[in-house]
Amino acid sequence: MATIGSGSARVSDTTSTSSAYLMTTNPTATEGNRLLRGASANDASKVPVYHYPPEQDERSKKAPFIEDRLNEELTNPEYVNRLYERWYSEGLSSNEVALGLDQIDNQEVQETYQNLGLGYREYIDWRNSM
């Protein structure tokens, strides 16, 4: 991983899967733009404290932000393959999928959705060449 101010940047190989149609992931910043707001238990003035990564609820081990969940799920090759197969079996074209994924206003998942649409286009090409 790249270190700020180190002068040299190393990037780990994130494309370890052999399938060409899977979505490739690029290393990005580890922190999102969103923070959770909470109150410090030790502070009498109850000044809000912002923290990231957010503390996970004991009942749920999932990340609280949908963007984090989506990025985690959409980098799982098994999940992505099932998603592509479902779209393919429903007869959706890559343009229909791209238009559907393009309707999101959330900037944090927009790049993930664009990569997903490109991966589906490559999946269709791979399936049609079989």
UniProtKB/Swiss-Prot annotation:
Composition bias type Polar residues, residue spans: 1-31
Keywords assigned: Host cytoplasm, Host nucleus, Secreted, Virulence
Motif RxLR-dEER, residue range(s) on this chain: 34-59
Subcellular compartments: Secreted; Host cytoplasm; Host nucleus
Function: Secreted effector that suppresses pattern-triggered immunity (PTI) in plant host.
Similarity comment: family membership: Belongs to the RxLR effector family.
Database matches in InterPro entries: RXLR
Residues in the signal sequence: none
Region described as Disordered: spans on this chain: 1-61
Keyword Secreted: yes
Major subcellular site: secreted
Pfam families membership: RXLR
Induction text: Expression is up-regulated in spores.
Keyword Secreted: yes
Classification lineage: Eukaryota, Sar, Stramenopiles, Oomycota, Peronosporales
Name recorded for this polypeptide: Secreted RxLR effector protein RXLR-C16
Domain free text: The RxLR-dEER motif acts to carry the protein into the host cell cytoplasm through binding to cell surface phosphatidylinositol-3-phosphate.
GO CC, one annotated term: host cell nucleus
GN (gene name): RXLR-C16
Taxonomic source organism: Plasmopara halstedii
